[in-house]
Structures are given as structure tokens and as C-alpha cells.
């Protein structure tokens, strides 16, 4: 499975990761949102807007963003939600809010657009797999490691 993660999530879900990159935290928004015509957003663009963030404690990279926005940009209304599912994306569209997202989710909802934000917040993105991967998964990880030249032969 591919996705964003942090160390807490890996521990709680009892899985390992093969990090592919640090992906930027972006904002998803309705195609009809006034900011949707822009190519990128700035933090100032978010002032006076509602920004949906996954609940505190779910990911410390998102929590860092949350705390920085709370401290430095009280003009942004932060809305917590529990889980990234269809309802969260539908709510973003329905409420004309912004939703913290990553570029890899570009096609997740037909009525949403994902825009980069000019800030330096990223989150690990990669493959997640069990602590005891099956032989086919190990072969895949070895092949991926060779392609990316990231790990030694004995690491899996």
C-alpha cells in the first residue's frame, strides 16, 4: 500500500515503510473555490478560510503545520476531521473549505483540485508493508531498492 506516514503510524499499524520521497503538504479545494484559479497558494491566501486538517496526533508532520498555523496565523480557521475518506473529500467540496492533501491524491475526487502551497512542510510518502513481508513482497522491495539504490541486499 502507498501513503503518507510517520513513525507513530508505523508503530500503531505494525508495519514498515519504504520511503519514496518527502512529499509537500498541499491544499485540496473545490474546482469552484475562488482560489482554484491560482497555480499555487501562499499562507496569506489561507487567511479568512477554513482549512481541514486530520485530527491532532494522527501525524506529527501535520501537527507541526497545525501548531505553526495556530501560533502564527490565527486568521485561518482550522477544522479537525478523523479520517481521510470519501466523506472528508465531499465535505471539503460541500463546505467550500480547503483540505490538507498531497500531490499524489490529485485524482482522488472529481470536484477537487490540489494546489501546492509556498511553505516548507513535507511528509514521508512511500510503500507500507508488514513486519514479515511475503516472498513476493520481498522480491518487489529488493527490485525497488536496486532501482532507487537506497538499501543494501540484507536490509529486508
Predicted feature locations:
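Short beta-strand-to-loop elements that line the ligand-binding cleft
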Residues: 74-85
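Hydrophobic beta-strand segments of well-ordered beta-sheets in folded domains
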Residues: 47-52, 76, 97-98, 125
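Central regulatory/effector-binding core of bacterial HTH transcription factors
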Residues: 1-10
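Thr-Gly-centered strand-to-loop micro-motif
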Residues: 30, 54-56, 101-102
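Beta-alpha-beta core module
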Residues: 11-18, 22-23, 86-135
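Extended ligand-binding regions for polar small-molecule ligands
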Residues: 39, 43-49, 124-156
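Secondary-structure junction motif
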Residues: 49-72, 137
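Flexible hinge/capping segments at coil-to-helix
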Residues: 13-25, 29-51, 138
Amino acid at each position: 500500500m502507498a501513503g503518507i506516514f510517520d513513525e507513530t503510524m508505523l508503530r500503531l499499524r505494525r508495519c514498515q515503510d519504504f520511503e519514496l520521497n518527502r512529499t509537500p503538504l498541499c491544499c485540496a479545494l473545490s474546482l469552484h473555490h475562488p482560489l482554484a484559479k491560482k497555480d499555487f497558494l501562499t499562507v496569506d491566501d489561507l487567511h479568512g478560510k477554513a482549512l481541514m486538517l486530520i485530527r491532532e496526533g494522527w501525524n506529527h508532520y501535520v501537527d507541526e503545520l497545525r501548531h505553526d498555523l495556530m501560533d502564527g496565523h490565527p486568521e485561518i480557521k482550522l477544522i479537525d476531521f478523523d479520517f481521510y475518506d470519501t466523506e472528508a473529500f465531499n465535505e471539503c467540496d460541500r463546505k467550500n473549505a480547503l483540505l490538507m492533501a498531497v500531490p499524489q491524491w490529485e485524482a482522488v475526487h472529481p470536484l477537487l483540485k490540489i494546489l501546492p502551497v509556498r511553505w516548507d512542510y513535507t511528509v514521508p510518502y512511500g510503500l507500507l508493508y508488514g513486519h514479515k513481508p511475503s516472498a513476493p513482497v520481498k522480491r518487489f522491495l529488493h527490485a525497488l531498492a536496486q532501482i532507487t539504490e537506497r538499501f543494501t541486499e540484507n536490509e529486508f
